[in-house]
UniProtKB/Swiss-Prot annotation:
GO terms for molecular function: tryptophan synthase activity. The lineage of its organism: Bacteria, Pseudomonadati, Chlamydiota, Chlamydiia, Chlamydiales. This is Tryptophan synthase beta chain 2. NCBIfam families: trpB. Keywords: Amino-acid biosynthesis, Aromatic amino acid biosynthesis, Lyase, Pyridoxal phosphate, Tryptophan biosynthesis.
Length: 391
């Protein structure tokens, strides 16, 4: 397919071009600076809890008639998800740039908690924008953000989800950029955000590669859920050059593709511009952004990071979907068989594995990125069970 622009880019209003360019220049000068890298490595190790383990799940593998399966345990990081990798990186960058205030958007609440945590660690003021609908379904994380000293601002415009929270955060940044850094939570937005977030999250694949080598394995298949795409691109990054390793991203199939209630950008979307970048996007024939649905707040976003668009069109990675129902089934299965409660986001990746496991050679090695833990989802799932919607 021919495109009018490369994936990514900087599609921003004039008022935001200055802060975006400033950030881009600062990132170029700091990303390979030894002091910055050493400080980040130290805080990831001594504060966030890296490296995270690689756990083989034999009971789960046996139950689904699968091969050898390992989980990359980002759920065991401080704050319970991969989001802290990026939040600490960006907040440390902001501090080096002399910023005193951090703003962020959040959907599932994990990026909000991670950003509030990083701000607490580094002594920065923190404001979090969150859709009113997401606040309702992610109350535990809202309580955590408040406890950590963040100001949580409810966004009541539009669909009241992640897209609308991003809009409000961008408005804030346009007014306050001299003192404020916008800590974007996924590998999307205007350049340099996708590159920056990928860099901070690539510690995941770096560790997986080393951990598998230590036990004498190389992976045949990597599976990760894809919302904006930061956990997946970080998990894939160091394996992209090795074409023997199959990469699979799993989008939110919601109530099913045919229902129209989903967030499957590659399945039914087409390239367009949203929030400053060009990538695959759910839109109607007039180019208006379509509403999305997922049981998982973290996957409920109408666009996907540009790195994934490149991987999709080149054929280096394949992208599939898991429905709400399939994700719930995977959530319960892992919890009961392994004593590990996954986030609903990560459960989409597990659902895809359950679907394809019988077709995989028994000697193959599969790694699933367990991007977060499911504590934040328990109230929502309990309510679904009470309502009889888990059938």
């Amino acid at each position: 397919m021919k495109h009018p622009y490369p994936f990514g880019g900087q599609f921003m209003p004039e008022i935001l071009m200055a802060p975006v360019q400033d950030l881009s220049n600062s990132w170029k000068s700091l990303q390979n600076h030894s002091d910055f890298k050493n400080e980040l490595d130290s805080v990831l190790k001594n504060y966030a809890g890296r490296p995270t383990p690689l756990t083989e799940i034999k009971n789960f593998a046996k139950a689904i008639h699968g091969p050898r399966i390992f989980l990359k345990r980002e759920d065991l990081l401080h704050t319970g998800a991969h989001k802290i990798n990026n939040a600490l990186g960006q907040c440390l960058l902001a501090k080096h740039l002399g910023k005193t205030r951090i703003i962020a958007e959040t959907g599932a609440g994990q990026h909000g908690v991670a950003t509030a945590t990083a701000c607490g660690c580094l002594g920065l003021e923190c404001v979090i924008y969150m859709g009113a609908k997401d606040i309702e379904r992610q109350k535990p994380n809202v309580d955590k953000m408040n406890l950590l000293g963040a100001e949580v601002i409810s966004v009541n415009q539009g669909a009241q989800t992640l897209k609308d929270a991003v809009n409000e955060a961008l408005r804030d940044w346009s007014k306050n950029y001299e003192s404020t850094h916008y800590c974007l939570g996924s590998a999307l937005g205007p350049s340099p955000y996708p590159e920056m977030v990928r860099n901070f999250q690539s510690v995941i694949s770096l560790e997986v590669k080393s951990q598998l080598q230590e036990i004498g394995f190389s992976p045949d298949l990597l599976i990760a859920c894809v919302g904006g795409g930061s956990n997946a691109i970080g998990f894939f990054h160091h394996f992209i050059p090795d074409t023997r390793v199959k990469l699979v991203g799993v989008e939110a199939g919601g109530l099913g593709i045919e229902s129209g209630h989903h967030a499957a950008r590659f399945a039914t979307g087409r390239p367009g511009v949203l929030h400053g970048f060009y990538s695959y996007l759910l839109q109607d024939n007039e180019g208006q952004v379509l509403p999305t649905h997922s049981i998982s707040a973290g996957l409920d976003y109408p666009a996907v990071g540009p790195d994934h668009a490149v991987l999709y069109e080149s054929g280096r990675a394949s992208y599939t979907v898991a429905t709400d129902k399939a994700a719930l089934e995977a959530f319960f299965l892992l919890s009961r068989l392994e004593g590990i409660i996954p986030a609903l986001e990560s459960s989409h990746a597990l659902a895809e594995l359950i679907n394809i496991a019988p077709t995989l050679p028994k000697e193959s090695v599969v790694v699933v990125n367990l991007s977060g833990r499911g504590d934040k989802d328990l109230e929502q799932i309990t309510n679904l069970i009470k309502a009889g919607n888990n059938e």
